């Protein structure tokens, strides 16, 4: 069969899994008065359709910001408005001001699920296919396998089609941006990433690698020649993109500031709910939120985030390469997730996207990370009654990855991209030849722990005095895994001596 035929089969399989998951429950189903993210997305459609633009982000009698107030950038609001027009055409009751609050029906659920699928088909899935086809030095079969594994990644499917969100939009735009700048379509790549950033502010997790990669390109071209011209063109593209997205909100200074305040609610504290990052895990032993003033918490969070991502960003600026860019995206996004302020459990998807992009380069570690990332959201998925689809999609993903990228056949020092690091260590410890075995043991320990915690969470009730015991354990175990991955990816980046050979010549 032609590769395009196989790719069509892959897409159809991915769509089938997505739609099957969408038949299950969603966030806040039948749980008044606040319901959940499903109601939040519906409510934003109600607000954007019935209120003028200037009232979208302000508290009023018609727009109670305490009830799922709009807190995403303008592009999300425009998307909500577009969906609202379609909803009003089908059934005005779905988006009627005030009276539609908490609206639930099978017809409305079908509509909402369809809007997610449409966004996926228009933005995310085409980007995945084009990215896989653009991969160099791998066979067509491996490109198809890569597309299959990426489209079967359970974390994104369960959150968008189960819990209910539109993460595929921002992640899709970000992937188009990665494609653009990796193929030297720098202006298109910059535009795509600006769209991602104006859809979800959490795309800031990816912003520094984009900036450093493009800046490094400008340096390589020479700031006195083509480099300065490229820098100016990119800057103009970014400014123009933001102006177009924010234009309705720039008529008054207070209006723009209110949008910014809604996007970055520092008053909420270091973290919300149970999230697998450093601050939530540390909170088990040391109540940082109670001990330190909020401005000190923000300062500490900023310092740790900045210091953890600085080495990779410096190397990417000095040695810009498509490979280095992909790995730095992983490292920086993971640094933000572990150390930054106001992290949500679903933000791990921002790390998972670039990990999917290096799946063909380090299949063992990528598959392991993607499994842990899905496991880290288990408390949320159980809350939404998504246990069965979680187990099935994880198994399907694991089978696909194990079939096309055999797990333990990809754990040599070369395949883990740790050869340079191991050689450096052996200069001081000649007997250091067991690194692959260590990695395999850590993987098995991680998987066994995840399976045990999943079984315990489902079969046992936590002690009355410790109602969040299993959720905290899941977050803590996931955090330990993520710290290990952060160290691993930084080692790969800093000890990579192949950038010069892998880097395309920048004229």
Curated annotation (Swiss-Prot):
Regions of this protein lying in the Cytoplasmic compartment: 1-2, 136-143, 194-229, 319-332, 383-385, 459-468
InterPro entries: Glyco_trans_ALG6/ALG8 (IPR004856)
Entry's localization field: Endoplasmic reticulum membrane
GO-annotated molecular function: dolichyl pyrophosphate Man9GlcNAc2 alpha-1,3-glucosyltransferase activity; glucosyltransferase activity
GO CC entries: endoplasmic reticulum membrane
Pfam families (UniProt xref): Alg6_Alg8 (PF03155)
Reaction equation(s) it catalyzes: an alpha-D-Man-(1->2)-alpha-D-Man-(1->2)-alpha-D-Man-(1->3)-[alpha-D-Man-(1->2)-alpha-D-Man-(1->3)-[alpha-D-Man-(1->2)-alpha-D-Man-(1->6)]-alpha-D-Man-(1->6)]-beta-D-Man-(1->4)-beta-D-GlcNAc-(1->4)-alpha-D-GlcNAc-diphospho-di-trans,poly-cis-dolichol + a di-trans,poly-cis-dolichyl beta-D-glucosyl phosphate = an alpha-D-Glc-(1->3)-alpha-D-Man-(1->2)-alpha-D-Man-(1->2)-alpha-D-Man-(1->3)-[alpha-D-Man-(1->2)-alpha-D-Man-(1->3)-[alpha-D-Man-(1->2)-alpha-D-Man-(1->6)]-alpha-D-Man-(1->6)]-beta-D-Man-(1->4)-beta-D-GlcNAc-(1->4)-alpha-D-GlcNAc-diphospho-di-trans,poly-cis-dolichol + a di-trans,poly-cis-dolichyl phosphate + H(+)
Transmembrane segments: 3-23, 115-135, 144-164, 173-193, 230-250, 298-318, 333-353, 362-382, 386-406, 438-458, 469-489
Keywords, sorted A to Z: Endoplasmic reticulum, Glycoprotein, Glycosyltransferase, Membrane, Transferase, Transmembrane, Transmembrane helix
Topological relation to the membrane, as annotated: Multi-pass membrane protein
Glycosylated residues, chain numbering: 59
Pathway annotation from the record: Protein modification; protein glycosylation
GO biological process: dolichol-linked oligosaccharide biosynthetic process; protein N-linked glycosylation
Documented EC number(s): 2.4.1.267
Enzyme class: transferase
Presence of keyword Transmembrane helix: yes
Record function comment: Dolichyl pyrophosphate Man9GlcNAc2 alpha-1,3-glucosyltransferase that operates in the biosynthetic pathway of dolichol-linked oligosaccharides, the glycan precursors employed in protein asparagine (N)-glycosylation. The assembly of dolichol-linked oligosaccharides begins on the cytosolic side of the endoplasmic reticulum membrane and finishes in its lumen. The sequential addition of sugars to dolichol pyrophosphate produces dolichol-linked oligosaccharides containing fourteen sugars, including two GlcNAcs, nine mannoses and three glucoses.
Family: Belongs to the ALG6/ALG8 glucosyltransferase family.
Name assigned to this protein: Dolichyl pyrophosphate Man9GlcNAc2 alpha-1,3-glucosyltransferase
Lineage of the organism: Eukaryota, Metazoa, Chordata, Craniata, Vertebrata
Gene: Alg6
